[in-house]
Amino acid sequence: MTDADNLPRHRSSRPPLPDALGKLCTEGKATAQYLWQVPDDQAARAKIVTILNQIAVEAQKQNRKEMGRDVTELLTAAKASPSPQQVDLLVGGFDRLIKLWQAAKSGL
């Protein structure tokens, strides 16, 4: 028996393949990050609201209640007047959504 046989087997560190919910979360984060460059871009803000509404629908289909709560908070932030704090809140919120999605997909 070698030392390699005695080592615990670890899960793969690769992120799960994105489904519709994962793609929406990733797209939302990218759009929110874009707001650092152009904070007053109304089209990007409207896109974020649309993405958040789609995430809410997908999360409900998958019974992901914790994601629904985050989406509600992010919708409020997305509709607020543009500011660096708002962009930071949106980017951080999409990060949380991505982590919640990854945890659900990995079985945690």
Residue ranges and their predicted role:
Residues 2-35, 58, 62-65, 81-108:
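Amphipathic, coiled-coil-like alpha-helical segments
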